């Protein structure tokens, strides 16, 4: 039996395709024939018909056909399926033989060629005698044939050739050798495929006809054989549905066979073959659930058919192969588009195959454990005459014997012994590892991390059994991280134990030390006596001695390992092993904790390192080092205790570096921070604990940061969630879970002992020089020096505020854009204890809104810390939010000379510009001066002098000015005419004289200016008196370039009598004036309506009386009639 006997035959696993042989092609020396052959077999696409082609010589001897039985009455079959039958029909017996022959229809020597072709066909038929194989002829021609019916000669000669060769017309083909050769070949293939299907259909009918002669008493094996053949021929015919149906029938028939120890292997072998075919076809038909159901049924039926107890490993091997084959089928189906899921993927089948392979290994170990004196049987009972078995699943020493009684027990024993001795030479671990590797790949693909880790552990253990310790260690080390992170401590302990054995057998010092450290720790579930043994071995290694062998190791491997350890001892030297503990769980726990999250630079930095041992016995360490991100401090945090190597495990509890199991040891450190580290974070980068002597072998346990290992985070989480009350400890003892790691602290500046006061009058007014008085007083006990002031806008605010805020120390001049928003490091001298100073800062805010201002005072002072004098830079800052507001609101109005509101003004007609300045400041404002700057399009009617100089405005008070202006010409109606600017110079009433006034420029609004065709103004006294004549003179001026026809009328009033023209029509020349004189005679006192003047311009109908009344008065105050006072009246009064 060879180790590969359990592999399925290649012909069973391949896809059956119709077998067609091509004869008459010289593919070596004839280029045309080579091109034809390449077109048949090279680069075949999936859409071409499934045919297997083979080039054979014309006189090739095909397998002889055995004589057909006419009766099965006395026939007793020797087995189910011959080992060569599938290969015979796949590769030896063709469904069709194609004879290629070069012959054109116009061949001059037609008769000779025809005869030669017929001879070749006859030779092929002779070699196929007794077979139903079809024969076809293909004529290779140089010319492209004419369409059917057009070439009479071709038709005649084709019929003659078919007659001579005894062929039907469907078996003669023409192949022109042209540029379209591949197209012709594909058409030929399709025709060949039809012939092949006919052949396989005939074979199926032939096999079915044999079944009529069978009986179930003596021909049970033939029922299975014939059903398998029918299914196989159906596959060759590509009728997969019928093939599946017949395979299912064959499978059921197999399990109907009487099973005995002598034929159980044959039954299982055939059941395995047929099951493979059924599952393959189910996957091919895209019915994976049917395939899975069939496989489960197959396993349930066969798993208890073990056979001979002495060959139990064979059953395990067979079971392993079943699962592996199904896994391969499943994986192949997935590659072709099938979708698998986490709970149903090929990995489970590979895993089960590995399980049975392991079972095979165990059985082989138990059954094949013969003495070395036992010799292999001679002659070899496993050898056959032909070198192969006649029937699948039979024993070589009793082929074709179907009797359940063993005729030769001695030969049977020899055969079993030969199989057992062969099995002993099988490397089972390689088989198991290959299957586990396949399973791991599948579980990784389908994201099943725990299954993957579980199988990787098994792989590692299998490598250990195979004595490949390097690979075992690599795999086990890889999966340990997962088990640590998920706290599978029992599993982790088992893996660590195997890893420790590997590292011992390879004499890997660092790995041996690392795994020993972890097996001694709290994550290990080993008993104390086992831990004590490991601890003792660890100390032996540190003392440069060989450790004791690990239990249950291979004897030969232990001897090799002891030599390796001896070599390690002879190479004694300074061996320091740095082991980072963040990725595993050592037997010592470490936590570092600063006393506070921050320390002032004039206070010593203090922190504690807490250590706790989990090993069985007290242990003494030699040195503790704490490292920081600033390495200057490392020298201050070293604790070293001299001890001999032999004292490491002595029961000594004295000394700071001796750790008692379960007790927390606190080690305190302090140092003075550097002044340049103010504002920086000091971090503990690592804590190193030395075990052993640095002069010999030494282990350095290195914790990153403030401590903690692979299990710390999970333990802290469990402790936080736990409601269990902590046990009371003695006063000098510390509960480990109550210690929280604090691995960093901040160095902050010394607490300043000065006071900073700000004096100001908020809110600030926009654009004024706002005064901030900063008072600094020292309360230090010693002089301070290098006092510096930083004042201005606090950084980090809106960029627009930065651009519109300017700070200066000189208030006598206004700030411009060149001044900064923040004045930094202004030297203000030194201060003695109790002394104070003042500094005035001026701020100009160009926009309204809130601003945060910063005042920062820094100074230097000498102080003593832990006997060392240091120079401390102290600082104190204060911030204040100041609101900036508008100092006043300015309202501008355009009115007529009658103080009526104007929407627009008229060219050359005077109007009034009125300004109202309303104080919005909570403080009194002094208006230093005001100025009206007119645009070129405006002129003043009189001198523009300020009317509000030196006016002081309280909150809510207003000051008004009035200016008489004239617009010489009309402007753009849409945009209006620019008026100019109104400039107000002002400052707070409370500021000193040296502070400059602020000039606020208000841009006056544009006004629409229009031309008027006729301007009318009136000259009349300011008042009248009852019954006294009141002369009124109206002036009419033509403002156009046209002669104006004017109709004038006066409407009387009840309060007046008048004399003058009541109605007149006149003409006014361009640019000239016309006067109209009236005498009004008032009749009543008080404000009285004047007689209304109405003007109608014939050329300008839009000129209305309503517009006219804007220019002339419509009423006047009339005083009552006066009388002379007599002296008596006066006296009486």
Curated annotation (Swiss-Prot):
It is found in: Golgi apparatus; Golgi apparatus, cis-Golgi network. Keywords: Acetylation, ER-Golgi transport, Golgi apparatus, Transport. It comes from the Eukaryota. The modification N6-acetyllysine is found at residue 245. Pfam families: Foie-gras_1 (PF11817), Gryzun-like (PF12742). GO terms for biological process: constitutive secretory pathway; COPII vesicle coating; endoplasmic reticulum to Golgi vesicle-mediated transport; Golgi organization; regulation of protein complex stability; vesicle tethering. GO terms for cellular component: cytoplasm; TRAPPIII protein complex. Its main location: Golgi. Belongs to the TRAPPC11 family. Involved in endoplasmic reticulum to Golgi apparatus trafficking at a very early stage. Component of the multisubunit TRAPP (transport protein particle) complex, which includes at least TRAPPC2, TRAPPC2L, TRAPPC3, TRAPPC3L, TRAPPC4, TRAPPC5, TRAPPC8, TRAPPC9, TRAPPC10, TRAPPC11 and TRAPPC12. This is Trafficking protein particle complex subunit 11.
């Amino acid at each position: 039996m060879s180790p590969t006997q359990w592999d399925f035959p290649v012909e069973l696993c391949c896809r059956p395709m119709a077998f067609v042989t091509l004869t008459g092609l010289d593919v070596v020396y004839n280029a045309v024939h080579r091109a034809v052959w390449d077109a048949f077999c090279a680069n075949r696409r999936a859409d071409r018909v499934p045919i297997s082609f083979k080039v054979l010589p014309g006189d090739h001897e095909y397998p002889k056909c055995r004589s057909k039985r006419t009766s099965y009455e006395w026939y007793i079959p020797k087995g189910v399926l011959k080992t060569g039958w599938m290969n015979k029909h796949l590769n030896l017996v063709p469904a069709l033989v194609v004879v290629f022959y070069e012959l054109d229809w116009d061949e001059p020597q037609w008769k000779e060629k025809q005869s030669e072709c017929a001879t070749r066909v006859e030779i092929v038929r002779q070699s196929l005698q007794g077979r139903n194989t079809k024969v076809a002829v293909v004529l290779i021609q140089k010319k492209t044939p004419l369409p059917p019916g057009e070439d009479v000669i071709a038709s005649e000669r084709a019929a003659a050739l078919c007659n001579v060769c005894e062929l039907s017309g469907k078996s003669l083909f023409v192949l022109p050798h042209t540029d379209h050769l591949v197209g012709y070949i594909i058409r030929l293939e399709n025709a060949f495929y039809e012939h092949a299907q006919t052949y396989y259909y005939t074979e199926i009918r032939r096999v079915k006809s044999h079944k009529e002669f069978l009986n179930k008493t003596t021909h049970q094996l033939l029922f299975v054989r014939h059903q398998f053949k029918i299914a196989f021929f159906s596959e060759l015919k590509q009728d997969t549905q019928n093939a599946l149906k017949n395979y299912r029938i064959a499978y059921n028939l197999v399990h109907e066979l009487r099973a005995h120890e002598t034929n159980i292997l044959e039954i299982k072998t055939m059941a395995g073959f047929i099951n493979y075919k059924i599952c393959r076809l189910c996957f091919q038909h895209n019915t994976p659930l049917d395939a899975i159901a069939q496989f489960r049924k197959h396993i349930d039926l066969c798993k208890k058919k073990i056979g001979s107890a002495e060959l139990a490993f064979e059953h395990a091997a067979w079971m392993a192969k079943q699962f592996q084959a199904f896994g391969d089928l499943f994986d192949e189906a997935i590659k072709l588009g099938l979708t698998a899921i986490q709970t149903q993927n090929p990995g489970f089948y590979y895993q089960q195959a590995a399980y049975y392979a392991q079972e095979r290994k165990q059985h082989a170990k138990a059954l094949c454990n013969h003495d070395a004196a036992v010799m292999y049987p001679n002659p070899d009972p496993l050898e056959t005459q032909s070198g192969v078995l006649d029937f699948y699943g039979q024993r070589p020493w009793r082929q074709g014997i179907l009797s359940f009684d063993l005729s030769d027990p001695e030969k049977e024993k020899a055969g079993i012994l030969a199989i057992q001795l062969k099995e002993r030479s099988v490397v089972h671990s390689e088989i198991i590892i290959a299957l586990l590797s396949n399973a791991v790949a599948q579980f990784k693909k389908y994201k099943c991390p725990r299954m993957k880790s579980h199988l990787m552990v098994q792989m590692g253990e299998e490598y250990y059994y195979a004595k490949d310790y390097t690979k075992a260690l690599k795999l086990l080390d890889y999966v340990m991280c997962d088990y640590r992170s998920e706290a599978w401590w029992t599993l982790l302990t088992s893996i660590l134990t195997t890893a420790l054995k590997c590292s011992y057998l390879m004499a890997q010092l660092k790995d041996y030390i690392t795994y020993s450290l972890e097996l001694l720790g709290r994550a290990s579930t080993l008993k104390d006596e086992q831990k004590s043994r490991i601890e003792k071995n660890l100390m032996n290694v540190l003392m440069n001695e060989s450790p004791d062998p690990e239990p249950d190791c291979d004897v030969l491997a232990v001897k090799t390992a002891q030599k390796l350890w001896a070599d390690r001892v002879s190479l004694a030297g300074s061996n320091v092993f740095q082991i980072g503990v963040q990725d595993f769980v050592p037997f010592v726990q470490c936590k570092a904790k600063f006393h506070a999250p921050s320390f002032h630079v004039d206070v010593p930095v203090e922190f504690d390192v807490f250590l706790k041992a989990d090993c069985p016995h007290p242990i003494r360490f030699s040195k503790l080092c704490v490292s920081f991100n600033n390495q200057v401090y490392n020298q201050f945090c070293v604790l070293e205790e001299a001890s001999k190597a032999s004292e490491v495990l002595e029961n000594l509890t004295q000394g700071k570096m001796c750790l008692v199991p379960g007790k927390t040891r606190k080690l305190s450190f302090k140092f003075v921070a550097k002044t340049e580290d103010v504002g920086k974070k000091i971090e503990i980068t690592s804590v190193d604990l030395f075990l052993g002597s640095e002069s010999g072998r030494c282990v350095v346990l290195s914790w990153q940061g403030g401590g903690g290992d692979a299990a710390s985070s999970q333990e802290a989480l469990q402790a936080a969630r736990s409601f269990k009350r902590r046990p009371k400890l003695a006063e000098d003892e510390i509960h480990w879970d109550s210690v929280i790691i604090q691995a960093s602290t901040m160095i902050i500046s010394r607490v300043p002992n000065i006071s900073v006061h700000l004096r100001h009058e908020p809110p600030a007014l926009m654009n004024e020089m706002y005064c901030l008085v900063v008072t600094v007083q020292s309360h230090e006990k010693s002089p301070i020096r290098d006092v510096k002031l930083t004042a201005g806008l606090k950084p980090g605010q809106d960029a627009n505020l930065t651009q519109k805020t300017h700070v200066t120390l000189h208030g006598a001049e206004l700030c411009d854009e060149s001044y900064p928003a923040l004045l930094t490091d202004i030297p203000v001298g030194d201060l003695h204890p109790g002394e104070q100073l003042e500094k005035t800062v001026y701020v100009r805010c160009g926009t309204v809104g809130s601003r945060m201002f910063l005042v920062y005072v820094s100074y230097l002072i000498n102080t003593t810390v832990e006997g060392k004098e240091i120079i401390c830079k102290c600082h104190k800052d204060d911030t204040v939010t100041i609101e900036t507001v508008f100092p006043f609101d300015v309202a501008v109005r355009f009115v007529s000379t009658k103080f009526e509101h104007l929407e627009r003004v008229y060219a050359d007609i005077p109007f009034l510009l009125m300004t109202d300045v309303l104080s919005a400041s909570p403080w009194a404002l002094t208006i230093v001066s005001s100025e009206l700057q007119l645009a070129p399009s405006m002129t003043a009617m009189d001198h523009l002098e300020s009317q509000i100089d030196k006016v002081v405005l309280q909150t809510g008070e207003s000051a008004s000015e009035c200016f008489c202006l004239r617009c010489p010409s009309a402007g753009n109606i849409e945009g209006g005419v620019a008026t100019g600017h109104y400039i107000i110079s002002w400052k707070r009433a409370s500021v000193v004289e040296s502070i400059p006034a602020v000039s606020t420029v208000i841009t006056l609004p544009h006004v629409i200016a229009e031309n008027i065709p006729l301007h009318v103004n009136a000259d009349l006294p300011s008042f009248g008196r009852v019954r006294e004549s009141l002369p009124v003179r109206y002036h009419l001026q033509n403002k156009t370039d046209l002669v104006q026809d004017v109709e004038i009328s006066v409407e009387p009033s009840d309060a007046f009598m008048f004399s003058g023209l009541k109605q007149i029509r006149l003409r006014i020349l361009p640019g000239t004036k016309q006067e109209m004189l009236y005498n009004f005679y008032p009749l009543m006192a008080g404000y009285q309506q004047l007689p209304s003047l109405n003007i109608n311009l014939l050329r300008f109908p839009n000129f209305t009386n309503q517009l006219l009344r804007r220019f002339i008065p419509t009423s006047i105050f009339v005083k009552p009639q006066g009388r002379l006072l007599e002296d008596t009246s006066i006296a009486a009064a």
